[in-house]
Amino acid sequence: MGAARDMPEIMRLSDEPPTTLPGWQRTFAPGELTLGLSPVTPDGDLERQVALTQAAEDAGFAAVWCRDIPLNVETFGDVGQIHDPFMYLTWLAAKTSTIALGTAAVVLSLAHPLLLAKRSAGLDRLSGGRFLMGVASGDRPEEFAAFGMDKGTRGEDFRENLSVLRKAWASRMRPVKWSRGRMGGAEVVPKPTAAGVPVLAVGSCLQTTEFNTAHTDGWLTYHRNLHDQKVMVDRWRASSEEQGVGFRPVGESLWIDLAEDPDYPAEGRDFGFRLGRNALLELLHSQQDLGLNHIMISLRHGNRPVEDALAELAEYVVPEFPALR
C-alpha cells in the first residue's frame, strides 16, 4: 500500500470513465451538436495553423482534428498536416488551454499497440485530458507494404491492437500477449488520466456496427446526404441501445467552400458543399435533428482565405452550436 501511495500520480490507474475528461465533455453530449475544425492550411505553415487553432478555441469550436498519414504516397498526394499527429497535437496543446485535440484518425492496424498506448496516454496527460483518439484500419497499400504489414489482415489487426491498447492502459505488471508480441514484468507508463483515452472509430474500421459500439466510445463517419446519414445514425443508436452501452456520439466530417454571399445556395462537392452561411446553418440544424453530435469542418479546399471563412463562422455560425464547456 505504501508503494502505491508513493507512486507518481501519472503512473496510477484510474477508475474514472474517459467520458468524464474535459475534451470529451467539451465536445459530446446527447442531443447536442458541436463543431470541430481541421486547422490545416494549403501552405502547411505551422504558425498559421496555431493561430487558426487559437481563433477556433476563442470562437467556441469544441475541437480541432488532424490525421495520421505516415508516408507521402505518390498516388494519393495528400499529406494532411505533414507532422506526426502526436507531435502536432502536443504543440497545439501547449498553445491552447480548453479546445479538444483529436485524431481522425490514427491508423491502428499499422501501429505498435504498446507504443501507441504510451504516446496517447502521454498526450492525454500533457493536454490536461483534452485528447480524443480517432482510430481507423487504414487503406493505403503502399503504407502496409512499407511497414511489413498485410493489408488483407488489417481488420483483424485492428481488433487485436485495440485489445492490447486497452490492456496496456489498464494493467500494472500483468502479462499481455498477442500475435506479434508479449509483455511480462513490465508496463506502459504514463497511465491515462482516466481509465483510458477516449477512442472513436473513424469509418467502419472493417468492423461490424456491433463491434464498434461495444469496443469504442463513439463514431466519426463521412459526409452523406441527410436521408442516408439518418439511416446510419439510427443503426448506430439501435446497436448502442441493444448492447446497453449508453450514449455513443456520432460525428461527421464536412468539407465546405464558404461563399461570401450569405444566401448562396448549397452546391454539392466532394465530401461536402459550396454554400453560404445561411444554407450552412440550415444544414447543421438538420444534421442535429437527425442525431449527429459533432461536425468536423475543413476549410482548406475553399476559395477564400481560411482566416476569412473562419471569422465568418465564428461570428454567425459557431454561436448556435458552441462548445459545451
Describe the residue ranges of each PLM region:
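Active-site-adjacent structural elements that line small-molecule/cofactor binding pockets in enzymes
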Residues: 1-325
